Regions:
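Short beta-strand element of the alpha/beta-hydrolase
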Residues: 64-68, 74-84, 104
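N-terminal targeting or regulatory segments adjacent to alpha/beta-hydrolase or S9 domains
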Residues: 1-47
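Residue in the alpha/beta-hydrolase core beta-strand immediately N-terminal to the catalytic nucleophile
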Residues: 154, 168-170, 192
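Cap/lid segment of the alpha/beta-hydrolase catalytic domain
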Residues: 89, 95-149, 205-208
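N-terminal cap/lid segment of alpha/beta-hydrolase-fold proteins
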Residues: 27-73
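Alpha/beta-hydrolase fold nucleophile elbow
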Residues: 162-175
């Protein structure tokens, strides 16, 4: 298998483009409702740290870390997505990117141990099973569809924040975060995308290779 030409083992769904075009049209119509609270984290004079909370399309409160370089002009933005399952690590990890001049946005995915709400029947964290959560329901109710829409809404919020260059949006992540960085680049106007071992990219191949373990174990059911 030539990994440079590999396009996955599943056929593209016939309604793929129409479905996501409708979801993008929907999420772009959702009113922006967010709040920024500055955090006392360090004595760095060139960086500002914020807790960012926003209300998503279904009323869930979603959390993201936000670090903004102090600048007289606009700065590029970097969306950093965390691995599965879990939440964003501490501020130090993101500070490395912010020190390069990027405003960093790092969202906690729903129900994976962070501060974002999963209001799909319960409040609080869940340990696993997110891949198949909602699979017997309408497609719109799958938790990963909701996470993708949260991501797209956060990008709109970033472009609304003063001092962010709306024409220089970038994304990065590893594992689950790599999968989300791929989706982020596909659904949004992204300038650069940095992907490290993208989990979620080809679950059928994982199953065929009999590697449905750990993070993938729910697909065997």
């Amino acid at each position: 298998m030539d990994i440079t030409e590999y396009l996955g083992s599943w056929d593209r769904p016939l309604d793929f483009d129409s479905y996501w075009n409708k979801k993008l049209e929907f999420i772009n119509s959702v009113p922006l409702d967010y709040e920024l609270t500055e955090v006392e984290f360090s004595n760095f004079d060139n960086l500002k740290y914020y807790d960012l909370y926003f209300t998503s399309f279904d009323g869930a409160r979603i959390y993201a870390k936000f670090i903004k370089p102090v600048s007289n002009g606009e700065v590029p933005a970097l969306f950093y997505f965390h691995g599965y399952p879990g939440c964003n690590r501490n501020w130090f990890e993101k500070t490395a990117y912010a020190s390069l001049g990027y405003a960093v946005f790092a969202m906690d995915f729903r129900g994976q141990g962070g501060k974002s709400q999963d209001i799909g029947g319960i409040l609080g964290t869940t340990v696993a099973g997110h891949i198949v959560a909602g699979i017997d329901d309408e497609l719109d109710n799958m938790i990963y569809v909701k996470n993708i829409l949260d991501m797209c809404l956060l990008i709109r919020i970033a472009k609304d924040i003063e001092g962010i260059d709306a024409n220089n949006i970038n994304c990065a992540g590893g594992s689950q975060g790599g999968g989300f960085a791929t989706m982020c680049a596909g659904l949004n106007d992204i300038k650069k995308c940095i992907i490290l071992y993208p989990f979620l990219s080809d679950m059928k191949k994982v199953y065929d290779l009999d590697l449905d373990l750990v993070a993938y174990e729910s697909i065997r059911y």
